[in-house]
Amino acid sequence: TFFAIIISLIIALGAAQTIGPRWLVFSMRMLLNIIRTIPSIIWAVIAVAAMGANALAGVAALTLYSTGYLGKFFSEAFESVDMKVARSLRGIGADSLQSFQYGIWPHAKPLIWSHCIWMLEYNIRSASIIGYVGAGGLGLQLHAYQEFHQWDRFATVLFCILIVVTVLDFLSEHIRRRIARRDGSNDALSD
């Protein structure tokens, strides 16, 4: 998820209509569409074929899949920001980086972090599935426990996954509530 976040932020800057030039927006959106079209399990099969049956193949598969979705989410978060502040900063002499840093990023950041947590939750669940095709991680462990009928260990791993996903779900909900409160207070101030 970490690698996907970094790659997605870079791609999203080019994919956001309010930030990138038109030719780059089209190219980046097309790239994100292609990546998102392929399910994570297929990315896992491709990665296992290219890298062998190991955890690195699982990381590569989830990174590619997550990049497609996070890139789209991030570019939409950037586009949802009211550009008045960024334009005002440019008007008083700020460069593009400063305009982004102070005019766009602070407003998009809460939504972006919420998407990051959601993707982390998704990837933890997906790791269980893609491991079944040899991409390492929790799924490979679950598959081994199933093969040897070690149902107590199988259940323990599933229970741990459930706990982690539940904690991440609560954390994501907390962030979404903070976003809603912040947006509500900003609306009240602008009236």
Q: What are these language model-derived features?
A:
Residues 32-63:
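Generic hydrophobic transmembrane alpha-helix motif, especially the helices
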Residues 2-32:
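Transmembrane-helix boundary motif in ABC transporter permease subunits
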Residues 23-38, 70, 77, 104, ...:
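Hydrophobic alpha-helical segments of integral membrane proteins
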Residues 49, 126-161, 180-187:
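Glycine-rich helix-loop "coupling/hinge" segments at transmembrane-helix boundaries
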